[in-house]
UniProtKB/Swiss-Prot annotation:
The gene is MT-CYB. Disulfide bonds: none annotated. One of its GO terms (cellular component) is mitochondrial inner membrane. The chain crosses the membrane at residues 33-53, 77-98, 113-133, 178-198, 226-246, 288-308, 320-340, 347-367. A ubiquinone binds at residue 201. Keywords: Electron transport, Heme, Iron, Membrane, Metal-binding, Mitochondrion, Mitochondrion inner membrane, Respiratory chain, Transmembrane, Transmembrane helix, Transport, Ubiquinone. Heme b b566 binds at residues 97, 196. It comes from Antechinus stuartii. This is Cytochrome b.
Amino acid sequence: MINLRKTHPLMKIINHSFIDLPTPSNISAWWNFGSLLGVCLIIQILTGFFLAMHYTSDTLTAFSSVAHICRDVNYGWLIHNLHANGASMFFMCLFLHVGRGIYYGSYLYKETWNIGVILLLTEMATAFVGYVLPWGQMSFWGATVITNLLSAIPYIGTTLAEWIWGGFAVDKATLTRFFAFHFILPFIVMALAIVHLLFLHETGSNNPSGINPDSDKIPFHPYYTIKDALGLIFLFLILLLLALFSPDSLGDPDNFSPANPLNTPPHIKPEWYFLFAYAILRSIPNKLGGVLALLASILILLIIPLLHTANQRSMMFRPISQTLFWILTANLITLTWIGGQPVEQPFIIIGQLASMLYFLLILVLMPSAGLFENYMLKPKW
């Protein structure tokens, strides 16, 4: 009897990707986040599709259409809450996924890593344009502040900002095009995710030890499908707890007020998952300098493979690098906290010190630790 799973042209691709895929036998729960991100993306596309059926991208009716979804549409409140909190879950998984890649040296698969960084940037763009759509106060002012940063680019900046706005300020044209962007970008993310997987399956997965695992591999199904299912249960549990019991805890109260160009909120800030980058942007008193630091804070991920100096791939057996990694984690949490605080002392100086430490850790301290660990491992007799 012919096994259709192994012979059918389409089923064969699925089989080689998710069923008979040879996987290292020792990968831990930190390897769950790839599949969780895939599920998050599907949840976001489905809930977003149903929201788009009832949403209107017009400045006069956008805010009331969101209220209409929550009040009048069958289970509209649930779809809305799942979509809003699903974005938070998405970025939580994303940060853990990137963190795991840095800790275990997965960035040495350069193609997979670079596509991953492009994915991260695309997802950040998607989340930003999506946050503008409800047309609340923070949506409007967030869009104004962030798009206004383009005007810091010398010579073409103002023209570029007005081109993005479709006018001389954030208005109806901006909202309409942001809705179009928010609809198309998740499908671009999906295509990039497939390319990400394609490159990953060229090399096979990394593992906690960082040693070539070819001698000890097991099929993905049933071992890791079961393991991923456990992660999924936790993901759904946390998402449902958020969406049903505390749906607005991660949002901003200002977004319950319709957008008003004549009234600026006291503290303009983005969603929590952008606060670390926002803190780095604000820590530099110069507009262009801030924009460059903001870009550098994300694009620095692209040069991490070039900064790998250690003889060992993973940080599992490198205690000094481990310490620096957890300092970097604490530093990012500090930046996230600072990004949500008003621009006053002592928050300004804390933000500036944390921003300096962020770049110092990645560019200087971690590569130096790798070299020092190499020296310590050399026989001294």
